[in-house]
């Protein structure tokens, strides 16, 4: 049986590929795919405006190719983990 961390990492990878395979290059997230991922997989997603998601894409897109590759997605996950950690620290 896989350890919880193994399962969590596998899920993060699977979610990337679930959305990246919907349009164009199956190894990148388009603006539409990223928007759908955020809105469906994150609690805060439904609260974000289109302009905020567009800004997020621009910030994540380090090489400015108008898509988010897996490395850029992992950077996004790292930033989310930092935010979640701060929230948890504040609650305790």
Curated annotation (Swiss-Prot):
PROSITE patterns in the cross-refs: EF_HAND_1, EF_HAND_2, S100_CABP
This protein's record includes keyword Membrane: yes
Compartments in which it is found: Nucleus envelope; Cytoplasm; Cell membrane
GO MF entry, a single one: S100 protein binding
Gene3D superfamilies reported in the protein's UniProt record: EF-hand
InterPro entries per UniProt: EF-hand-dom_pair, EF_Hand_1_Ca_BS, EF_hand_dom, S-100A6, S100/CaBP7/8-like_CS, S100_Ca-bd_sub
Recorded topology in the membrane: Peripheral membrane protein
Residues binding Ca(2+) 2, per UniProt: 61, 63, 65, 72
Keywords of the record: Acetylation, Calcium, Cell membrane, Cytoplasm, Membrane, Metal-binding, Nucleus, Repeat
GO cellular component, one term: nucleus
Modified residues (N6-acetyllysine): 40
SMART domains: EFh, S_100
Binding positions (Ca(2+) 1): 28, 33
Subunit structure: Homodimer; head to tail assembly of 2 subunits. Interacts with CACYBP in a calcium-dependent manner. Interacts with ANXA2 and ANXA11 (via N-terminus). Interacts with SUGT1. Interacts with TP53; has higher affinity for TP53 that is phosphorylated on its N-terminal domain, and lower affinity for TP53 that is phosphorylated on its C-terminal domain. Interacts with tropomyosin. Interacts with FKBP4. Interacts with PPP5C (via TPR repeats); the interaction is calcium-dependent and modulates PPP5C activity. Interacts with TPPP; this interaction inhibits TPPP dimerization.
Protein name per UniProt: Protein S100-A6
Species lineage: Eukaryota, Metazoa, Chordata, Craniata, Vertebrata
């Amino acid at each position: 049986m896989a350890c919880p961390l193994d399962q969590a990492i596998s899920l993060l990878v699977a979610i990337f590929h679930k959305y990246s395979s919907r349009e164009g290059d199956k190894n990148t997230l388009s603006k539409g795919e990223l928007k759908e991922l955020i809105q469906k997989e994150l609690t805060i997603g439904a609260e974000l405006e289109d302009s905020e998601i567009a800004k997020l894409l621009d910030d994540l897109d380090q090489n400015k190719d108008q898509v988010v590759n897996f490395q850029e997605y992992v950077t996004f996950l790292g930033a989310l983990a930092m935010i979640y950690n701060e929230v948890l620290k504040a609650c305790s």
